[in-house]
Regions:
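Conserved catalytic-core segment of NTP-binding enzymes
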Residues: 81, 86-180
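P-loop/Walker-type NTP enzyme "switch/lid" segment
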Residues: 5-77, 182-187
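Extended, charge-rich low-complexity interaction segments
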Residues: 196-212
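A short, charged, Gly/Pro-tolerant segment at domain boundaries
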Residues: 216-242
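Short, hinge-like loop/turn segments at secondary-structure boundaries
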Residues: 17-22, 124-125, 152-155, 188-189
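Short beta-strand "acidic-cap" motif of Rossmann-like dinucleotide-binding folds
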Residues: 1-4, 107
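Residue-level signature of catalytic and energy-coupling elements of molecular machines
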Residues: 4, 12, 27, 48, ...
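C-terminal boundary of histidine-terminating zinc-finger modules
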Residues: 182-201
Length: 242
């Protein structure tokens, strides 16, 4: 199951050529239940669509946010993996989902803005929430070596300034077939299954199947609600001085 949690510019359903009648904004408004908006995509993947371009979806109150997560806890569907696709940056919404996740996978390109965003996210999660383990996906690289070099660049910075443990999860090649798949509104692994990006993504999926499940309660949606209610929003906390 995939939650499109880029709550301001959600578009997973559009990219896959699916038509979502209702979305998370209708759930928040009390017009329907979460189970009513779930749509099925390729290979049986279930998708929870968000509301693209709706400002209040990107600025949920703590009460709305908690209610939304409780709705996830009430789902009866059998879920193998629950993937949360967040926006870039360090908004409270991104941080909340990251804190609830069992594994945090950071997708980064070899560009200054992408590297800066990745480091900023790891910095806040490490220093403010005591999260040290991050999986890195080097995206749109020209070779495995370029992806490895990007990972080493990130590792050197985090080792110097943060108490963080990074793992290179995958290197996804720069592949024009990804763009072509988006134009066709299909998954690249479906439209072009034997291309470099598709093979790399399949390899990442197989690798994810072997990731160990932590023994602590983190990663459960009910635990997410508890954490959300215990921690104050960052805007209410005293600023942290460097």
């Amino acid at each position: 199951m995939v939650l499109d949690a880029d709550l301001g510019l959600a578009n997973v359903d559009v990219m896959l050529g699916l038509r979502a009648g209702r979305n998370l904004s209708h759930v928040l408004a009390g017009l329907c239940e979460l189970k009513d908006i779930i749509i099925e995509g390729p290979y049986g993947v279930k998708i929870i669509p968000s509301a693209s371009g709706t400002q209040n979806m990107a600025e949920l109150t703590p009460a709305q946010h908690a209610g939304l997560i409780r709705a996830f806890g009430n789902l009866q569907d059998e879920i193998d993996f629950f993937i949360v696709d967040t926006a870039a940056g360090i908004s409270d919404m991104v941080l909340s989902f990251a804190r609830a996740a069992q594994d945090i996978v950071i997708v980064v390109c070899d560009e200054p803005t992408s590297i800066t965003d990745a480091y900023a996210l790891m910095k806040i999660l490490s220093r403010e929430y005591d999260i040290q383990r991050f999986k890195i996906v080097a995206n749109m690289v020209r070779s495995y070596r370029e992806g490895r070099d990007l990972f080493i660049k990130l590792t050197r910075v985090t080792e110097r300034f943060l108490d963080a443990n990074l793992e290179l999860a995958a290197c996804i090649p720069l592949d024009d077939n990804v763009r072509q798949a988006v134009k066709r509104q299909k998954l690249v692994v479906e439209a072009f299954p034997h291309t470099p990006a598709a093979l790399a993504l399949n390899s990442l999926a197989s690798k994810a199947m072997t990731w160990p499940i932590p023994h602590h309660p983190g990663g459960h949606l009910e635990f997410f609600v508890e954490r959300l209610l215990v921690h104050k929003p960052r805007a209410m906390e005293a600023p942290i001085c460097e």
